């Protein structure tokens, strides 16, 4: 239990504050007066004041509304709000519109809203024009208590065109989002058997035409580099981005509500065509991001994959020799894992609650998980594929973003590392791969792995897959 010492040498605890409240109407006011210059003590008193009876002398709290320390003001406002008296409406409104701390202003708006008093409605309607979207959202929250009132509803609906996306999102959810009463063809935790442990040789855009809506739980992929490999030649960078846009738009359709897409990309260098030309570096993850959020993917996290410097191409060698400014080119030891979630009005808890307790407990991540967003993992390659997913990378993604029994998808299957890893972690996989060389390579792994053994994994042409669906 935290205990503070006041100026008189007495110790202050929750119990002590409770005793003072009960012993005398003026006792707390005296304690505050004695410690007026000690903001830490004042905050402790305000935090632990608890229930405030109607007979309580609250003038000392009102006096603290102008205190220099914002945390003291915040807790003073919070305690004034407990009184739920419209006597304080004008005072709280003044704080909500004039205090120089967003934290204090937001709490003042919250206190006005918690009164649930018709007298507060005009004040909260005025606050909707505040330039700070956090304050506006707090006012919206207070006004939604009166949802159904014609004036309030019409005023709030107009905010769907508000400049701030946070405000627009709140209003859209409350007034314009379609109610998802129509149930999906399958329960959230389930998927179609003909998609489980299947590898299809074909263009992912053609394959996904035969995949039902909301059938994938997790997508993790590394798109082909723009014109940096012989198997990925595009007429222009714009054409490359449009190709990825098509792929991830269809991926969005087949992804279950509120589930994740993780895209592994990095800026790529296209070599110069001659000594009289410079090489070109394309910021793929940053350019792709725009398309993803536009189609409805919600950005959640950026994870940095850090590789050992010895494993990457040496770009700094020339500079190490001449040290001339402007020619500095550091070695690129990072790639991005951009984490997105399919847009939904539901919280993550809803997704979790779609599973039974046995699955939830069995899927819990074990000790030793990564706690920050910089992951140090060595890259992998082999004689067939020069850019292979490290197993450790796949393990983390699959364990952190899916449950046992889920269907994990990679639209650019490559050598099939994600599929093998998913299966070893008791998930199912669905892979597509356009290049026959890599498709055949995955088939050869049947003899080396009990994951891709006969009877477990189906290797299908596009036509065979189409027939299995139809």
Give residue spans per PLM region:
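TPR/TPR-like (Sel1-like) alpha-helical repeat modules
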Residues: 154-164
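Core catalytic lobe of class I
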Residues: 69, 100-101, 107, 132-134, ...
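S-adenosyl-L-methionine
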Residues: 183-207, 448-470
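Basic, amphipathic N-terminal segments that precede the first structured/catalytic domain
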Residues: 141, 165-195, 199
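Structural detector for internal amphipathic alpha-helices that build alpha-solenoid repeat scaffolds
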Residues: 3-22, 30-33, 40-55, 60-66, ...
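Class I S-adenosyl-L-methionine-dependent methyltransferase module
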Residues: 144-148, 165-172, 176, 284-288, ...
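Class I S-adenosyl-L-methionine
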Residues: 93, 157, 172, 293, ...
């Amino acid at each position: 239990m935290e205990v503070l010492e006041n100026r008189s040498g007495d110790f202050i605890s929750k119990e002590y504050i409770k005793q003072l409240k009960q012993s005398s109407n003026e006792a707390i006011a005296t304690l505050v007066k004695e410690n007026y210059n000690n903001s830490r003590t004042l905050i402790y008193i305000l935090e632990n004041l608890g229930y405030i009876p109607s007979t309580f002398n609250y003038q000392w709290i009102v006096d603290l509304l102008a205190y220099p320390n914002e945390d003291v003001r915040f807790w003073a406002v919070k305690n004034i709000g407990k009184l739920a008296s419209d006597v304080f409406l004008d005072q709280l409104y003044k704080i909500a519109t004039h205090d120089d701390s967003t934290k204090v202003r937001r709490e003042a708006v919250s206190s006005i809203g918690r009164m649930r008093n018709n007298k507060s409605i005009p004040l909260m309607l005025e606050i909707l024009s505040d330039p700070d979207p956090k304050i506006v959202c707090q006012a919206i929250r207070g006004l939604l208590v009166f949802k159904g009132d014609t004036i309030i509803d019409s005023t709030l609906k107009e905010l769907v065109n508000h400049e701030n996306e946070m405000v627009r999102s709140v209003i859209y959810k409350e007034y314009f989002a379609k109610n998802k009463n129509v149930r999906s063809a399958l329960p959230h935790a389930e998927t179609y058997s003909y998609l489980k442990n299947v590898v299809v040789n074909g263009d992912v855009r053609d394959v996904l035409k035969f995949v039902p809506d909301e059938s994938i739980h997790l997508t993790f992929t590394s798109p082909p580099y723009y014109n940096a490999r012989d198997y990925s030649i595009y007429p222009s960078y714009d054409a490359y981005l449009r190709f990825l846009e098509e792929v991830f738009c269809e991926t969005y359709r087949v992804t279950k509500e509120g589930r994740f897409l993780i895209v592994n990309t990095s800026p790529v260098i296209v070599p110069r065509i001659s000594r009289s030309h410079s090489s070109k570096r394309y910021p793929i993850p940053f350019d792709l991001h725009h398309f993803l959020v536009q189609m409805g993917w919600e950005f959640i996290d950026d994870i940095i994959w850090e590789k050992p410097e010895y494993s990457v191409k040496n770009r700094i060698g020339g500079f190490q020799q001449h040290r001339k400014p402007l020619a500095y080119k550091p070695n690129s030891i990072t790639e991005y894992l951009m984490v997105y979630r399919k847009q939904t009005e539901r919280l993550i808890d809803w997704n979790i609650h779609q599973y039974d307790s046995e699955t939830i407990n069995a899927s819990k991540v074990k000790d030793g998980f990564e706690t920050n967003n910089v992951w140090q993992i060595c890259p992998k390659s082999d004689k067939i594929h020069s850019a292979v997913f490290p197993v450790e990378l796949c393990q983390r993604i699959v364990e952190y973003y899916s449950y046992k029994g889920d269907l994990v998808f990679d639209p650019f299957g490559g050598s099939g590392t994600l599929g093998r890893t998913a299966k070893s972690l008791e998930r199912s996989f669905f892979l597509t791969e356009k290049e026959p060389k890599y498709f055949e390579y995955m088939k050869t792994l049947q003899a080396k792995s009990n994951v891709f053994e006969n009877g477990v994994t189906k290797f299908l042409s596009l036509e065979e897959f189409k027939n299995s669906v139809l």
